[in-house]
Swiss-Prot record:
Protein name, UniProt field: Spindle and kinetochore-associated protein 3
GO cellular component: centrosome; cytosol; kinetochore; meiotic spindle; mitotic spindle; outer kinetochore; SKA complex; spindle microtubule
Main location, first listed in the record: cytoplasm
Lineage, broadest ranks: Eukaryota, Metazoa, Chordata, Craniata, Vertebrata
Main function: Component of the SKA1 complex, a microtubule-binding subcomplex of the outer kinetochore that is essential for proper chromosome segregation. The SKA1 complex is a direct component of the kinetochore-microtubule interface and directly associates with microtubules as oligomeric assemblies. The complex facilitates the processive movement of microspheres along a microtubule in a depolymerization-coupled manner. In the complex, it mediates the microtubule-stimulated oligomerization.
Similarity remark: Belongs to the SKA3 family.
Compartments reported by the entry: Cytoplasm, Cytoskeleton, Spindle; Chromosome, Centromere, Kinetochore
Amino acid sequence: MDPIRSFCGKLRSLASTLDCETARLQRALDGEESDFEDYPMRILYDLHSEVQTLKDDVNILLDKARLENQEGIDFIKATKVLMEKNSMDIMKIREYFQKYGYSPRVKKNSVHEQEAINSDPELSNCENFQKTDVKDDLSDPPVASSCISEKSPRSPQLSDFGLERYIVSQVLPNPPQAVNNYKEEPVIVTPPTKQSLVKVLKTPKCALKMDDFECVTPKLEHFGISEYTMCLNEDYTMGLKNARNNKSEEAIDTESRLNDNVFATPSPIIQQLEKSDAEYTNSPLVPTFCTPGLKIPSTKNSIALVSTNYPLSKTNSSSNDLEVEDRTSLVLNSDTCFENLTDPSSPTISSYENLLRTPTPPEVTKIPEDILQLLSKYNSNLATPIAIKAVPPSKRFLKHGQNIRDVSNKEN
């Protein structure tokens, strides 16, 4: 039963598929199927889009090629302009060099053409010259052929630029003879060759004269440095200070005999340092510090210093104007110190009035006439001033004390 059932199922499915296909074909024949029309249109559209993209790519490539072509054309034009400029510059340089005897280089093609043209008439002449002047050719190198210009290249000189005054004359041994010999040599015509040689003159030899340029050696000078002057114990300062007070040689010899205990020093220094210390080494005085009205006893004679009561100046009044009668020396003798070993007396103080001493005012006796005339213009009642009397310092001090007492009483 099973195989029959499966066979019937397959037949049924085949019949259904045949019915569907027949119905679809029928619709296609009748024009009712739309899928057959859309498919070719889609293909055509795809083809058009591909062609358009290809056209765009081709246009881009053409634009690039056109730009490259334009750049090439511009470059060619620029190179042509530069070539013209360079040709003009080369012509100017060639003309400038030709002024100094330089000949332009001949191209190889032109040389070969000239050789082919001029070979026939020159060969006969060259054979004759070769037979007669074989020895001369062996001794001297061949001269330049006719294809090269006769003018030899010449280096520019200062005279070409108008600088003749800067030319340095150089004297050479017999230079004109070499020039004359060069001019008198016969010109030998040789067959043209590719590498034509030019006879170059040798530079004349000049013997150097060193008589005027000999190096003079400096003379040796003695600076007074010896084993006696190289002493390091003395720096020569005292000797230089006392150089003006040198004595005669005899007196120096006598003093050197007396002073045998002096240490060994150089001879020029011994002559100046053997003198006594009291003559040249005077020590400075002791600084004195004075106060007005205070008497300080001296160390030698134990005598009190007397304070002077000189009136101070009108403009400058200071304590430094006091003068000291006795001054103590820096060096003290032992004998005098032992004798004056007694206690010094106490300092005596002067009167209290002298401590507060003030300068006396100037005595105005009379106003100058020119000042009085000026003052009288502004004040007609101005009378001549009366002379002012000087007041002693004691009275002035008493008046000042009375004024202070009056003020204190008023405050009380």
